[in-house]
Amino acid sequence: MATKSVLMLGSGFVTRPTLDVLTDSGIKVTVACRTLESAKKLSAGVQHSTPISLDVNDDAALDAEVAKHDLVISLIPYTFHATVIKSAIRQKKHVVTTSYVSPAMMELDQAAKDAGITVMNEIGLDPGIDHLYAIKTIEEVHAAGGKIKTFLSYCGGLPAPESSDNPLGYKFSWSSRGVLLALRNAASFYKDGKVTNVAGPELMATAKPYFIYPGFAFVAYPNRDSTPYKERYQIPEADNIVRGTLRYQGFPQFIKVLVDIGFLSDEEQPFLKEAIPWKEATQKIVKASSASEQDIVSTIVSNATFESTEEQKRIVAGLKWLGIFSDKKITPRGNALDTLCATLEEKMQFEEGERDLVMLQHKFEIENKDGSRETRTSSLCEYGAPIGSGGYSAMAKLVGVPCAVAVKFVLDGTISDRGVLAPMNSKINDPLMKELKEKYGIECKEKVVA
């Protein structure tokens, strides 16, 4: 087989494992970023890789680069995927992304089929590995004449327990803005056969302790819209369908207070355009009578709700740790959300030697053909290499490696369906699961627990 070549768009933290897996397989990779510096940094010392500067908004430049390669990987923000896919359709080249298929991408399905190309999506961790093991159990149960009555799927990218040493029990390996914005999303899911909707401001109040292993104090809350999964996973019989997020205990209560006091608002505020002391910014955001810590705290306590006095103390201490009552100058970003993000990113980074953790678990409540009931779980618990050791974070590995394996399989014809795809059937999924398990040790452990 002639040497294949791939155009990889993006240089974010998940791109390195993808680059390594592909170049180790002898595939040539052109690393393309807006800035040449970022592309050079990612490809430094990697055989078979070439850095270039590319603006995906420039159709002519994008088409010219796509034309030189067999496949394009889009690891840039999902809002650009449709632009990339359109270019690939024009040039008749395959595409792989790790993002959810958006309506704008799905609209290109017929054009992709007509061009004879595969546009493979949702093949990272979540979405990605989660689909592989959800479909596996669902297809097995259906083949045996059983029914899936409940499907719960929770995933969290977290600091390892020993590194969860701040009031949120959370650290940022990428933009904190995206993490915080997700906490304002409304959620929809099936409960007892009915669609349940939760408004964005109420999301954190719905978080509940969630048992996976005794050694972890997780809480879980629903993620955006789980209702399409009745159809996507072909489980019309399911009464309960929830896909959600895992965090450590204490996280939702802390975030809920930030919401209550106006810190997650992205409304422009003139006073947040200058580097004023945090206590003055906080006084104005919470509308306290003065910038003294006492006045600010009493305003926060009266505007937010707390489950107990003990929790109130913990959260107020956490806000103090963040520095929002202090004389320290803010990094002005024009609104409360982004100004807070600047401080979170400064105080809540992973430090040298710390590790991240990814936990993913599906829980299936099954009614067997004979009417008996059982509960099965599929669980993945992965720790990253310590920061600074040169290894991958758990999150980077679990997004980047499945992406690379999908690229290899599209190039060699193992994945041969055309159009806009996601891993939703065993024909696509079985080879991916086999390769991920046998070659990279990536698998969900399956158990019958009740």
From Swiss-Prot:
Gene Ontology MF terms: saccharopine dehydrogenase (NADP+, L-glutamate-forming) activity
Residues binding NADP(+): 11-14, 33-35, 55-56, 76, 98-99, 125-127, 175
PANTHER family linked: ALPHA-AMINOADIPIC SEMIALDEHYDE SYNTHASE, MITOCHONDRIAL, SACCHAROPINE DEHYDROGENASE
EC number, as in UniProt: 1.5.1.10
GO cellular component, one term: cytoplasm
Pfam name, any one: Sacchrp_dh_C
Protein name: Saccharopine dehydrogenase [NADP(+), L-glutamate-forming]
Species in which this protein is naturally found: Pyricularia oryzae (strain 70-15 / ATCC MYA-4617 / FGSC 8958) (Rice blast fungus)
